[in-house]
């Protein structure tokens, strides 16, 4: 009896340690790449967001190919229709985020990302028939209220930036839902899914990127005059992006898309503070800070409300469950937050 309890405690402690390590990995890489990209675009004028994203996935493809060659990534299957659908959502997500970062202040960029929580909840209601309690719904409304306060008062908001942020939010929510969906449906690990998606994303973004960037900025990427410092930041951005891509898949695989977004309030605070520290007080005023605090309080409230009995219930599943998956799902239930 004592040995069984000890083994259970040890397993719980190990899971908690892995969850914390995965989350810290995501926090460090996500905050780092936002700040590096902002410096590369704002300070050194490399405004080619789509091409930059293609280079990110090109670097990720090189790593996954190398790991596959070494045998660390095992062969797996992902049907082309599902792969192409995921890549479509993911490309719109990444391009939208990069363009939003270029056209908006760091503050509005990160605050807009907060709205991915209610969007992700809506997707779960529509696609997975999840039902939320009254407190959970009210917490989502509080998040929206905070975002609205920041949207109205942030002087750096413009129509193009707002539209880019809206596209980024919806496509990112769909992409994150699909990460969890595909990993579960096809029993794919984080590295396996990344090995399938990164080459297609790299090829499509590097093909479309230069033309889209020229349309957005009226500048040609091949005419950009690299300096030693800007080249260093470009290489640094590509290197960090590998960790960012991998950590996102790891975290969403261990948690869920909504929980992954709820935990994001720590990254929100870090990015806002570091953004205002390194890039000036652009768009910062009392109302923006108030809106930020309201939104973050709403996120914390959501985390508490949804974790209570009846706070978030799944009435049915959108993914067919086979007999072989039932056993694995029993084990996976211990891994989800």
Swiss-Prot record:
Entry keyword annotation includes Repeat: no
Membrane topology: Multi-pass membrane protein
One Gene Ontology term, aspect cellular component: Golgi membrane
Expression (tissue specificity): Ubiquitous.
Family annotation (Pfam families): TPT
Keyword Metal-binding: no
InterPro entries, A to Z: Sugar_P_trans_dom, TPT_transporter
Main location: Golgi
Biased composition range(s): Polar residues: 319-330
Highest taxon of the lineage: Eukaryota
Alphabetic keyword roster: Antiport, Golgi apparatus, Membrane, Phosphoprotein, Sugar transport, Transmembrane, Transmembrane helix, Transport
Subcellular location(s) per record: Golgi apparatus membrane
Residue positions where Phosphoserine is found in the record: 333
Residues that span the membrane, as ranges: 16-36, 53-73, 83-103, 106-126, 138-158, 162-182, 191-211, 226-246, 260-280, 283-303
One GO biological process term: nucleotide-sugar transmembrane transport
Region (Disordered): 307-337
GO molecular function ontology, one term from the record: transmembrane transporter activity
Family: Belongs to the TPT transporter family. TPT (TC 2.A.7.9) subfamily.
Function description: Nucleotide-sugar transporter that transports UDP-rhamnose or UDP-galactose and UMP in a strict counter-exchange mode.
Record protein name field: UDP-rhamnose/UDP-galactose transporter 4
Organism of this sequence: Arabidopsis thaliana
Phylogenetic classification of the source organism: Eukaryota, Viridiplantae, Streptophyta, Embryophyta, Tracheophyta
